[in-house]
């Protein structure tokens, strides 16, 4: 089975649009997401454009602030602090990567926890690992939604995650644990990686290396979730971290690239923005 993130995200965005349509009468306004883009990296520009289009579909107000890559770290942090204090703003996202002279860690930590729609703030990360209410990172959240929509049984399964980044690898491992999978995190220093991956019933790959996972690394019937977005060095076309053509016949479930995890990441960003909005509404009522 091929899981189309494009189709699933379209259904979920339609449901969110119906939900948001009732907000002006109920709450007086719709959620407001502010996206900050520093520089003109083509990939970042494309991602930001996709987020703006999704916001329009769902009915969320989207403001994109574009700044040159010459902006100083202090100027960017000051801008974020102003948005933190702006009651009309429910979600703040700074598109990564940032220029080398700006600390991504400082930027992420400066965004107010309650407006951190990416789920990267240290307090949100801590809450995730403590099983407390928090904003879940978009890509891991989307991965779990995709598997559940495809009817994948996660409980009790052997899950292998290749990649240990704070953005995907570590949080998706935690979400799989929360679904009662038995999780192994593999990485560049893992000894005999093919032996590890062949033992997986669920394989999540997020390492950013085109077609890294080959057919001999996957057992028959494995659920394969490909998070990578790369350029095929031979064709120049988009491809994932797994050799899709070779692995698709062996996999029980697989996600394509493009059209797999990517659309679900943006879909979950919309969901997180709505959640941040509703939490802020709830807090304002109880204050």
PLM feature spans:
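Positively charged, low-complexity intrinsically disordered leader regions
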Residues: 1-27
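Short beta-strand segments enriched in small/hydrophobic residues
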Residues: 31-39
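Rossmann-fold NAD(P)-binding glycine/threonine-rich loop
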Residues: 104-121, 125, 228-283
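Glycine-rich phosphate/diphosphate-binding loop of Rossmann-like nucleotide-binding domains
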Residues: 38-52, 134-223, 227, 232, ...
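Short beta-strand elements in bilobed, periplasmic/extracellular small-molecule ligand-binding domains
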Residues: 55-69, 183-185
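A charged, well-structured terminal subsegment
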Residues: 147-155, 275-276, 280-285
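Anion-binding alpha/beta catalytic cores of soluble intermediary-metabolism enzymes, centered on
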Residues: 93-154
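Short, well-structured alpha-helical segments in soluble
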Residues: 75-87
């Amino acid at each position: 089975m091929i899981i189309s993130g494009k189709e699933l995200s379209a259904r979920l965005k339609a449901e969110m649009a119906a939900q948001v349509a009732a907000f002006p009468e109920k709450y007086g306004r719709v959620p407001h997401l502010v996206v900050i883009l520093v520089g003109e990296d083509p990939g970042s520009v494309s991602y930001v454009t996709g987020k703006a289009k999704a916001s329009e579909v769902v009915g969320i107000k989207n403001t994109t602030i574009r700044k040159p890559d010459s902006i100083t770290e202090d100027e960017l942090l000051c801008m974020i602090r102003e948005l933190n204090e702006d009651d009309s703003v429910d979600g703040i996202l700074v598109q990564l990567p940032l220029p080398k002279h700006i600390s991504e860690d400082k930027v992420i930590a400066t965004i107010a926890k309650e407006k951190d729609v990416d789920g990267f703030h240290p307090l949100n990360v801590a809450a995730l690992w403590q099983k407390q209410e928090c904003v879940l990172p978009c890509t891991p959240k989307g991965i779990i939604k995709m598997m559940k929509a495809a009817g994948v049984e996660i409980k009790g399964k052997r899950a292998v995650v290749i990649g240990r980044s704070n953005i995907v690898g570590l949080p998706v491992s935690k979400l799989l644990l929360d679904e009662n999978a038995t999780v192994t995190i593999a990485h560049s220093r893992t000894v005999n990686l093919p032996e590890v991956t062949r033992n997986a019933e669920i394989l999540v790959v997020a390492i950013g290396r085109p077609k890294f996972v080959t057919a001999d690394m996957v057992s028959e019937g494995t659920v394969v979730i490909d998070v990578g977005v790369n350029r095929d060095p031979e064709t120049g076309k988009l491809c994932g971290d797994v050799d899709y053509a070779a692995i698709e016949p062996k996999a029980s479930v697989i996600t394509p690239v493009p059209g797999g995890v990517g659309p679900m990441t943006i879909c979950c960003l919309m969901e997180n923005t709505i959640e941040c909005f509703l939490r802020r509404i709830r807090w304002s009522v109880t204050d």
